[in-house]
Amino acid sequence: MTNIRKTHPLMKIINNAFIDLPAPSNISSWWNFGSLLGICLILQILTGLFLAMHYTSDTTTAFSSVTHICRDVNYGWIIRYMHANGASMFFICLFLHVGRGLYYGSYAFLETWNVGVILLFATMATAFMGYVLPWGQMSFWGATVITNLLSAIPYIGTDLVEWIWGGFSVDKATLTRFFAFHFILPFIIAALAMVHLLFLHETGSNNPTGISSDADKIPFHPYYTIKDILGALLLILALMLLVLFAPDLLGDPDNYTPANPLNTPPHIKPEWYFLFAYAILRSIPNKLGGVLALALSILILVLVPLLHTSKQRSMMFRPISQCMFWILVADLLTLTWIGGQPVEHPYIIIGQLASIMYFLLILVLMPMASTIENNLLKW
């Protein structure tokens, strides 16, 4: 008799995706982050669900409901900090996952890559709205500043902002709708992740060499299941170290002050994982220009497959491109640092140079490096 996992309509899908899936024999630990992102998402949905049971999305009670969760709910503090720091782990995995895609040329799978970019946008939107919910000072002012950017859109800008706010300022209506969206979006992300996986399994995984691995495939289970379990254990270890020893390390102290529309914090800044984009936004003196640069800093990922000029797929055997890639990483770290600094000399000019460098690297220098490598190899 044929095994049930190969015949049952539902089990067959799971079997073909996680058990009998033919996988390249040489994929490194950089290929672990997809499964880690899945674990992060499940963890965020579960902790978020338990937080939502005690949270109230009203301006008068939101802050105190979060305090109540931390003080009075059984293990509420650990659920809250796992959710807050889980978001940080989520973005660390996201950035490494995207970086892996850039380095090894995984963006050649166009559908998978583009769904991934949509996933990145959806996750950023979810994280932004989640940051508003505790209704601390940084929640309120972050929401005010970021939503206000839409007013830079010509003609419809002001109406659009007031429509999003549900009034003439960030208030009760804004908080309620942000909570509703923050609750629904992770499920949309989960659905998109399935589409992401569907497209990936149409082609099969890429591998570090960027060469077809059809001649040498191994079953996903047990080889990569055990590898993913190791990755998951390390992820949970890192998360719990953060939660239990330094839960507020990545947060902003201003968010422990209840939201006050009459008192602006001296430095308004988003969570650390948005700082690179925030630095690009701030480095352009024009409001509309800044908003466009902010959007393009992520949207530029869609252009990456079109800018691929190399005859090779992966950067594994391309030292000049490798050099450009690591300069890009250093540039993004610089932007992250600048995003958290006040707007004063010398930070302004460093931010502007790093922003120019970011776009220059992706649009000009990396394609140029690839062309030079092709010529050096007489291709």
From Swiss-Prot:
* Residues binding a ubiquinone: H201
Write out the transmembrane intervals. 33-53, 77-98, 113-133, 178-198, 226-246, 288-308, 320-340, 347-367
Q: By its UniProt entry, which PROSITE patterns does this protein fall under? A: CYTB_CTER, CYTB_NTER
Q: Where is this protein chiefly located?
A: mitochondrion
What detail does the entry give on cofactor binding? Binds 2 heme b groups non-covalently.
GO BP terms: namely: mitochondrial electron transport, ubiquinol to cytochrome c
Enumerate the cofactors the protein uses: heme b
GO MF assignments: metal ion binding; ubiquinol-cytochrome-c reductase activity
Bilayer topology: Multi-pass membrane protein
Which positions are annotated as binding heme b b566?
Answer: H97, H196
Name any GO cellular component annotation: mitochondrial inner membrane
Write out the similarity annotation.
Answer: Belongs to the cytochrome b family.
According to its UniProt entry, what is the function of this protein? Component of the ubiquinol-cytochrome c reductase complex (complex III or cytochrome b-c1 complex) that is part of the mitochondrial respiratory chain. The b-c1 complex mediates electron transfer from ubiquinol to cytochrome c. Contributes to the generation of a proton gradient across the mitochondrial membrane that is then used for ATP synthesis.
Q: How does it assemble?
A: The cytochrome bc1 complex contains 11 subunits: 3 respiratory subunits (MT-CYB, CYC1 and UQCRFS1), 2 core proteins (UQCRC1 and UQCRC2) and 6 low-molecular weight proteins (UQCRH/QCR6, UQCRB/QCR7, UQCRQ/QCR8, UQCR10/QCR9, UQCR11/QCR10 and a cleavage product of UQCRFS1). This cytochrome bc1 complex then forms a dimer.
Additional notes on this entry: Heme 1 (or BL or b562) is low-potential and absorbs at about 562 nm, and heme 2 (or BH or b566) is high-potential and absorbs at about 566 nm.
Q: Specify the protein name.
A: Cytochrome b
State the organism named in the record: Alcelaphus buselaphus
